[in-house]
Amino acid sequence: MREGALALLRLAAVALAAPVVVAQAATAQQLLGGYAAQAAREMPAFTQFSAARGAEFYRAERPRADGVKAGCAGCHTADPRASGRTRANKDIAPLAPVANPQRFTDPAQVEKWFGRNCKDVLERDCTAQEKGDFIAYLLSVR
């Protein structure tokens, strides 16, 4: 009986921890694992992330409701190995981990910037698949 209760407690702990996989990640690959699990929940047909889709997402310019076209490369530059500039003229460190090894090492920062930038560019939250494709692309940049 006691073993059964312990097993249930362990199972409950795993179930409760599942949604916060992204919050506990320490590397880009761990972030991708968390986003993959989330993408599979959001979209049962999900199979894997695509660097090609991520590159397309990064380079795309999208018209916003105010008529202004916005895209990642608008501030981050066409080359994610290069430093970018915000609209307020502040420096942005390179997005590609090959040029900025600290990129994607702090899950809270990753989510903070996806939150801000997705809402600014897309006028909505990014999906887990979009986030994963985006990171897969940036990891592929050499």
Residue ranges and their predicted role:
Residues 109-142:
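C-terminal capping alpha-helices of c-type cytochrome domains
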Residues 29-66:
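Electrostatic cytochrome c docking/interface patches
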Residues 23-28:
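Boundary at the C-terminal end of the N-terminal hydrophobic targeting segment
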Residues 69-79, 134:
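The canonical Cys-X-X-Cys-His
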Residues 10-20:
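Bacterial N-terminal signal peptides
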Residues 93-108:
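Short microdomains enriched in Cys/His and/or Lys/Arg
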